[in-house]
Design a protein with these regions (language model features):
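Phosphate-handling catalytic cores of nucleic-acid transaction enzymes
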Residues: 1-394
Length: 394
């Protein structure tokens, strides 16, 4: 996701005719609170983006002070006022639509909206408060088209919009994204989903320290920062990437496969498949810039196309799981939570250890009846250990 922010909106991939796509991703990471979504993002390039943008802020502060002195001198000498320096911005926390337009109009490569909670991003853009044109404007951000916004005081023009969006969401709140309203106008379908899975057993203190040392001085971190740095250096340079014929055939055939899959699905999932068809080429463009040594001068090759299909299969599986979660009734949701909790506890735990954390999700009698059904259907194995009742995954 951080690569989507770094690459900016001046890079496009040519599919056919005048159909082009940018590497703009909208990502919702699904996982319970406290799972470590933010630290993971920081380790996967977020810290580097923050460091880079902080450097830009320092440069802007210095340039602004110099500009203020120049303005003062110009007034004294009755000269034209010098041009105000531009504050370079690559990403922002949840902001209003008005602020987004103001920043984007000064940063033509676009800016990402990154937050711990994806709902706060949408609420900041008045997604749930605004009606009519406000909602349509939010939807149009995903399309990466131009934005002409006349106001009482001025008219801001953004020739080419680029606003990647990323944030986390708890599984219980998924219905706020995949709602009937969001399904009708395509808001839900615009999101890629990523389910975060917790390891059954926490790492030991020794292993935790070892991992920290590996990350701080690893060659992987150096390569990651070097790659993101390359993208940032290239982000202000417009370029259109074409595909080698073999790569083009692979991706277009995969797009055809998604069309067929979509037609066999319900209306909500059909809309998701339609957006995933465009995401094929957005992801391909992003991978091209990540792996190609000279991405601005090279065609997208067959190897990148195959990598793209692998990544897209991951997102398709996560989409199916996300939409499947919405279709679960309350009993099915509690059953999933019981199974997930047993898995989190290492695949084997006492009934009490599973039941206690889920007391807000199900009453005692409801929990017991669903647990009994899971045991009867073979989803869980129940054994007695003295007075304690143990349950485990098969």
């Amino acid at each position: 996701m951080n690569a989507s922010v770094a690459i900016g909106g001046h890079k496009k991939i040519v599919i056919m005719g005048d159909w082009t796509e940018k590497a703009c991703l909208w990502m919702a990471s699904i996982g319970k609170s406290g799972l470590g979504k933010t630290p993971l993002n920081q380790k996967c390039g977020g810290a580097f983006l923050k460091k880079t943008q902080s450097g830009w802020m320092q440069e802007f502060d210095a340039a602004k002070k110099e500009w203020e002195r120049a303005v003062k001198n110009a007034k004294e000498d009755r000269l034209d006022e010098p041009e105000r320096p531009v504050h370079k911005v690559m990403y922002a926390n949840p902001i209003t639509m008005e602020t987004l337009r103001q920043i984007h109009s000064e940063n033509s490569a676009g800016l990402g909206l990154l937050s711990d909670e994806i709902l706060s991003v949408l609420e900041g853009l008045n997604q749930y408060k605004g009606k009519g044109n406000d909602r349509q404007t939010v939807l149009s951000l995903w399309n990466c088209d131009s934005d002409e916004t006349p106001t009482l005081n001025e008219s801001r023009s953004i020739p080419s919009v680029f606003v990647p969006i990323s944030g986390g969401i708890q599984e219980d709140l998924l219905r706020k994204i995949i709602s009937d309203e969001n399904a009708r106008d395509g808001m839900a379908a615009r999101f890629l989903f990523n389910h975060l899975i917790q390891s059954p057993n926490p790492v030991t203190v020794e292993r935790f320290k070892e991992i920290g040392e590996l990350l701080s001085g690893s060659q992987g971190r150096i390569i990651l920062e070097r790659t993101l740095g390359k993208l940032i250096c290239l982000r202000d340079q417009p370029n259109q990437v074409t595909m080698e014929s073999n790569a083009e055939d692979l991706l277009l055939n995969f797009q055809h496969y998604l069309k067929r899959e979509g037609r066999q699905s319900n209306d909500q999932v059909f809309a998701a498949y339609a957006k995933l068809q465009r995401y094929i080429f957005r992801v391909a463009l992003l991978l091209h810039y990540l792996f190609e040594r000279e991405p601005d001068s090279a065609d997208l090759n067959e190897d990148t196309a195959n990598k793209t299909i692998t990544v897209m299969m991951f997102f398709i599986a996560n989409m199916k799981r996300a939409y499947g979660t919405i279709e679960l009734n309350k009993k099915e949701m509690v059953a999933r939570k019981i199974l997930n909790k047993v898995a989190e506890l290492g695949g084997h735990a006492s009934v009490r250890d599973v039941k206690q954390p889920l007391r807000k999700s199900a009453k005692s009698g409801e929990f017991d009846s669903i647990l009994k059904l899971l045991v009867e259907t073979g989803e869980l194995i129940q054994t007695e250990d003295g007075k304690a009742v143990q349950i485990s995954l098969p």
